[in-house]
Amino acid sequence: HRDIPAVARIAAQNTLLNRFALEDILRAVMTPDAPHADIAALFAAQKACFASGITRPVPHRLDQLRRLRRAILAHEQDIEAALQSDLGKCRTEAYMCEIGMVLSELGYLLRRTRRYCRDTHVLTPLAQFPARSFIRHDPMGVVLIMSPWNYPFLLTIEPLLGALAGGNCCILKPSKDAPATSAIIRQICAECFPLEEVAIVEGGRTENQALLDQPFDKIFFTGSSHVGQEVLRRAAEHLTPVTLELGGKSPVIVAKDADLTLAARRIAFGKLLNAGQTCVAPDYVLVAREVEDAFVAALQKQFDQLCPDPLHSAEYVHIVNQKHFDRLTGLMASGQIVYGGSIDPAALRIAPTILRNVSPDSPVMQEEIFGPILPILPVSGIDEAIAFAAARPHPLACYLFTKDRAVQRRVLDTLAFGGGCINDTIIHLVTSRMPFGGVGHSGMGGYHGRDSFRCFTHDKSIVKKALWLDLPMRYTPYSKKKETLIRFFLK
């Protein structure tokens, strides 16, 4: 399933790789305990592959994407089983939130990659006449994609699509907390790609550190802000450009004129999805005080309808591990539990929980919740809601429920956040036609669709000068006439 002779040929051309047996390189991606030397060798193999130019032709990129699509379709049930094993995701949620989104992005890029790869021709300034100006969209080189456990298939494969469309070689580092999904991704990559084009390194902190020792041409990281800061610090040692997809406390603002039933239903959906273990999940609600009681009642009703038996429902995801379960149960003490609060420690399940009488200084308001706990904070009006959200680090998302267009404009103009919705939650990231990304503490850079291609390419500006005419005004010695011409052209 791998073109071993191709790897051997590349190894033979690279003096660094001559120190390592091919079996050692293969072991680096096939086992979770790869030594640092093997990771360095794997990186060198991919650098040599990229230097050969094999990943640059557009037909090769499209063939990679088609092979990946066929493999995903062939292994769809295996992917569903892996997501069920790691997180307890039901088949529908696994397809809606992971497999289907990957296939949608794949189709989008298959239809457009050829166009994206074409040089972009631009007008040439008159002062540079005669010449042609154009922008090449060059691959970055060898890229590292580090993904989290909460959407382990989507958040590993979706950035890979942009990297392949951009003509890069890739090393994937999935989370150790989603081992079943990591295993099926490893199998798919082994079937689709030679090692020197796409490889997967499994493991934990040791492997992460060894990977960050390498001078990658691009790093794409999805995860917590704390780890993202460490990735950025390590990348700075090599001046490696980084895209960070982080998180934060994404607020929901419910104005007094909101449709409370619809707002409650859509907020409940956003919080129930993956049991709140979503980087853009509603984190807390700022609700107009005069409608607080009615909104909480509507929210309780929607939780009852959407997930009537959360501790036993096959459609409700469990918490990923004991560490996060203990953290979340500790946060439940930050306010008055007015709904939910039940837990099943053996199954790592926490029912959707509504908290009231929550202090802004309480533990639940100091960190991203990343679970099915929803604090409700009453505010006097839109001014207080905006001031509250603006005083905190920029979140990855913000959600506003109101019919008032002036309020909508004001929130969009005033608050800084990655992206969001008006009168809904979550759905802004379910498109290939808009970028998804954070700002400030919630991340830097974006991807999806064309922005995924841009994320993994470098715009190289080129001026191709004609040989038949060479205007003399730029050359010394300067004269009044030359200065007059320069002033004519440059104004």
Predicted feature locations:
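Rossmann-like NAD(P) dinucleotide-binding subdomain of oxidoreductase/dehydrogenase enzymes
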Residues: 126-262, 379
